[in-house]
Swiss-Prot record:
Binds 2 divalent metal cations per subunit. Has a high-affinity and a low affinity metal-binding site. The true nature of the physiological cofactor is under debate. The enzyme is active with cobalt, zinc, manganese or divalent iron ions. Most likely, methionine aminopeptidases function as mononuclear Fe(2+)-metalloproteases under physiological conditions, and the catalytically relevant metal-binding site has been assigned to the histidine-containing high-affinity site. It comes from Neosartorya fischeri (strain ATCC 1020 / DSM 3700 / CBS 544.65 / FGSC A1164 / JCM 1740 / NRRL 181 / WB 181) (Aspergillus fischerianus). Cotranslationally removes the N-terminal methionine from nascent proteins. The N-terminal methionine is often cleaved when the second residue in the primary sequence is small and uncharged (Met-Ala-, Cys, Gly, Pro, Ser, Thr, or Val). One of its GO terms (cellular component) is cytoplasm. PROSITE patterns: MAP_2. Residues 69-85 have a biased composition (Basic residues). Substrate binds at H215, H324. This is Methionine aminopeptidase 2-2.
Length: 463
């Protein structure tokens, strides 16, 4: 989810835009434990339980020599495990349903799939003492939580790609299908106070068509928007488990005339991932992204357009329960000398456009985010006070939409919400658009910075 810059971040919904950078997303002990930095230092290891089975298959006698074999050994009924592409093990008896409704924790009872592991080019800089320090950056639940959230994202988005995202579908049906899947696979419907904080949506599903680049979602009682075969659709949604948010996005186009646009942005995102890592500077990452993206052009209906990196929206770091931290990764050459550090989590995303490559706030509302620095102690409007209690009890710092409020049964909230926004207690986010008639695309992955390499936690077979 793209992030606005601090200069534009606390603006009112339709405040004037400046030429400053805007981040792309708004900020408002188990058997599944994993190590913080050791996975890449020592490699991901499998389960020793299969060693005896492998030995038997190779004709090696694994029985105690002094035991006389009197009966033919019965064939073991032990369920075999298969290795996933990432090298971890999973029981393969259970399969996901369509629509997805089987808990990911049921499908992977002992260990969640690991993301794409990419060692750094030079790992000699990491001493044993540094590795021990880095392993303490993350608690025991950090990797299991992140890997569970990533697997939920993969399964839900692949279902959406196959079954939901089709010409003629309403964007509301796509959004609800994605969000129902996330809640079902996480096991938390978020209907009781506090349940939303355990697992669920990391932010509202963004479904942005054509010149709308980011921050659009269906709202209640608005006219249905129908997906057309000539549209370019950006799908951006987040999944969290215990506040560990996986932020990943992709673009769908049914007409191959947009292929170069999608390829440019996908390759630019992968370039950003390639250059990301411990001690990498934001300026270097941005320059590399821009060079790759703007090497492409796309021909649409006989006219050739250069693909432009959108310059006032950025990638960002992710903090617990906060989709946006304090660091930004522009998609263009810049002077940002901030460095990435061990233990950090980043959303590496890029947006490309056939238009100006600059976004403005549009009319409408995408969602809301609680400003934790502002108290509601001086509120006078009773509806605003009541609404703020609902927000704090059910969403906290996680961005939410009007659909989420109505799902909780909240009614007649618009006046109270306006009061909260006017007092700076809640921030309202608008859709971000390029010029009409242009087309925009987005691809995004979440990465974890281990001491020995990076883990592209949201990587899948699709992108």
């Amino acid at each position: 989810m793209g992030s606005k810059s601090p200069e534009g971040h606390w603006q009112a919904p339709h405040a004037s835009n400046s030429n400053e950078l805007k981040p792309a997303n708004p900020d408002p002990q188990t058997s599944q434990n994993g190590s913080g930095s050791a996975d890449l230092d020592r490699g991901v290891i499998g389960d020793d339980d299969d060693d005896d089975e492998d030995a038997e298959e190779n004709g090696v006698n694994t029985e105690t020599p002094n035991v006389e074999k009197k009966k033919k050994r019965k064939k073991s009924n032990k369920k075999k495990k298969k290795k996933t592409k990432s090298g971890t093990l999973s029981v393969t008896e259970l399969k996901q349903t369509s629509p997805p409704r089987v808990l990911v924790s049921t499908l992977f009872p002992s260990e969640y799939p690991v993301g794409e592991l990419v060692p750094y080019d030079c790992t000699t800089r990491t001493t044993d003492e540094e590795s021990r320090y880095n392993s303490r950056l993350w608690d025991d639940d950090f990797l299991p939580d992140y890997r569970q959230a990533a697997e939920i994202h993969r399964q839900v988005r692949q279902y959406a790609q196959k079954e939901l995202i089709k010409p003629g579908a309403t964007l509301l049906s796509i959004a609800e299908g994605i969000e129902d899947g996330v809640r079902a696979l996480s096991g938390h419907q978020g209907l009781e106070p506090g349940d939303f904080f355990k697992a669920g949506m990391g932010f509202p599903t963004g479904l942005c068509l054509n010149h709308i680049a980011a921050h659009w979602t269906p709202n209640p009682r608005e006219k249905d928007v129908i997906l057309d075969k000539g549209d370019v659709l950006k799908v951006d949604f987040g999944v969290h488990v215990n506040g560990r948010i996986v932020d990943s996005a992709f673009t769908v186009a049914f007409d191959d005339k947009y292929d170069n646009l999608l390829t440019a942005v996908r390759e630019a995102t992968n370039t950003g991932i390639k250059h990301a890592g411990v001690d990498a500077r934001m300026s270097d990452i941005g320059a590399a992204i821009q060079e790759v993206m703007e090497s492409y052009e796309v021909e649409i209906d006989g006219k050739v357009f250069p693909v432009k990196a959108i310059r006032n929206i950025t990638g960002h770091d992710i903090l617990r329960y906060h989709i946006h931290g304090g660091k930004q990764i522009p998609f263009i050459k810049n002077n940002n000398q901030d460095k990435m550090e061990e233990g950090e989590v980043y959303a590496i995303e890029t947006f490309g456009s056939t238009g100006r490559g600059f976004l403005d706030d549009d009319v409408g509302v995408y969602g809301y985010g609680r400003n934790e620095n502002m108290s509601g102690a001086n509120l006078r409007l009773s509806s605003a006070k009541s609404l703020l209690k609902t927000i704090d009890a059910n969403f906290g710092s996680i961005v939410f939409s009007r659909r989420y409020l109505e799902r909780l049964g909240v009614k007649n909230y618009l006046l109270g919400m306006k009061n909260l926004v006017d007092n700076g207690i809640v921030e309202c986010y608008s859709p971000l658009v390029d010029v009409k008639g242009s087309y925009t695309a987005q691809f995004e992955h979440t990465i974890l910075l281990h001491s020995g390499g990076k883990e592209v936690i949201s990587r899948g077979d699709d992108y």
